Amino acid sequence: IPRYIDNGIEDRIWSYWGGNIKKGNDGKYHLFVCGWLESSTKGHMEWPNSYVFNAVSDNLTGPFVARNMIGKGHNPEVFQLKDGRYVLYVIDGRYVTDNINGNWEYGKFDFNARDRRIIEGLSNLSFAQREDGSYIMVCRGGGSWISYDGLSEYNQITDKRVYPSVEGRFEDPVIWRDHIQYHMIVNDWLGRIAFYLRSKDGIKWVTDPGEAYMPG
């Protein structure tokens, strides 16, 4: 059976990784995805030289076509501020724009650990807007941080990881909030599984029984 190529994004030049979809005011779906040259002899290890693209589709599942290259970066995650601007996180930086189809300005977040140990560094960040309009962020190590408006300084509010209390090598958390609660899925590369967690406030998390997904 041939592979279904209309789901997501296909390209003979770029090898894509990750991806975050946001519906724009133009009614189209925008996939923010990073990629490196398919021709690279390093293969996946070329990821430090990734670029971030804005790919567009009329459908949520694609096919997406890369419209423009935003700049260098890896592991993109996009979110929208209360004032309508878009923030595109990448490892060790972020881009900001007034127009999802416009030009993006590069900058960096400010972090204040507040005399707490930073858990496994600040990479692979994931964000969710809180009920009061502030933003919570969970970093790769499982520490929680809060910013007043999503761009202002992020302050660490935990001194231990929020992940399940089991031995594991956790990374790539993804958090979001719906009208009821906060949700998180996090990978454990040691156990080769992923866990699903829930929270009422985005700070104290409960791990649901079972696994979000596992090999096979």
Where are these regions (language model features)?
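Carbohydrate-active catalytic/glycan-binding domains of CAZyme proteins
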Residues: 1-216
